[in-house]
Structure formats: structure tokens, C-alpha cells
Amino acid sequence: MKILYGIQGTGNGHVARAREILPILNKYADVDVILSGNQSQIDPGFHVNYRSEGLTFKSSKKGGIAYMKSILTASPIDLIRDIRQLPVKKYDLVISDFEPVSSWSALINGVPCVDMSHQAAVNHELSPKPQSIDRMGAYVLSHYNPAKKKYGFHFEAFAENIFIPVIRKEVR
């Protein structure tokens, strides 16, 4: 089996999780990696086959998404080009850790895609929600990664497809 593993490179958590998950996937399949975004401060420590700027969000001073700053620095033409040019048809499966290029390319090309991310847990109907909801953030969360099957990582396994977090060996 040939798998494309899409990793969101805009945060340290996605890369740290990939460092633990990739060796397991490599035992069972031939795995290639796409890393999109470039804000992680962690050295991946694994081979990256494809790189993309992806769709990167800028953070506000309060820790949320700075929408205007994100829009002004986005390059939708590059994003669409990357989605169209990614050779996703040569894979049997795409696994996406909230990575949009691989998941949108999989959707467009009819390749099965699974979302394995913290965001899948946060977006789950049983996930604890704040009293006031950021509608734009909720929209982005539900459309950023269009994978049909979703498995989430959260502090509590509150549903059948939600698991406790993947913790790096260095921290355990």
C-alpha cells in the first residue's frame, strides 16, 4: 500500500505527532510526506517528499486567527496550483493531519482520505464547545480539510473515533 501523509507545518503539534506516527505507518506501508506551511519550530527529523506553502493562518496577539493578516499573506493561486499538481493519484490512501493540499487534492481526484488531527476532535459534535463561537473559525475548521473519515486526538477520548493525544517519546 502507498500512503501520502499530509502534515500541517504551521504548528509544532502536527510535526511532533508525525514524528511518532510515521515510524508506525512505515512498518505497514510505503509512505511519502507532504509538509505544508513553514511555521513549525521543530525539525521534522524525517524525509519530506513534497513541500507547499499551503494555506497558512497568521496568529493574533490574543492567540486566535488574524483573518485580515492571513488574507493579505495568502496566495490562493499557489494553493490551487499545489492542489492540482500534487501527484495524489499514485497513492492508495491520503492521511492528513489537518493539511489542506493533500486532502483537497484527494477529494478532487477521488483518492480516499482520512483526517487524523486534533482539529477533527475539536470539530466533533460531542466536543466541548466555548460559550461564544467564532463563526469564521468554525467555518474554517469544518472546511479546511475535506476528508470524509475523521479520527481526532483530544485530552479525553469522548467518542469512538477520538483518541488521547500522541505524546512525543522525549516528553513521556
Describe the predicted segments one by one:
Residues 5-9, 31-79:
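Conserved nucleotide-sugar phosphate-binding/catalytic loop shared by glycosyltransferases and other
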Residues 6-19:
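A short, glycine/small-residue-rich beta-strand->loop->alpha-helix junction that serves as a flexible
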Residues 27-33, 89:
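A generic structural motif
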Residues 35-41, 97-101, 152-158:
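Short, polar loop motifs at secondary-structure junctions
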Residues 43-55, 110-113, 160-170:
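Active-site regions of enzymes building and remodeling cell-envelope glycoconjugates
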Residues 77-90:
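Short, well-structured alpha-helical segments in soluble
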Residues 91-138:
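Conserved nucleotide-sugar donor-interacting segment of glycosyltransferase catalytic cores
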Residues 124-172:
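A nucleotide-sugar donor-handling region in carbohydrate enzymes
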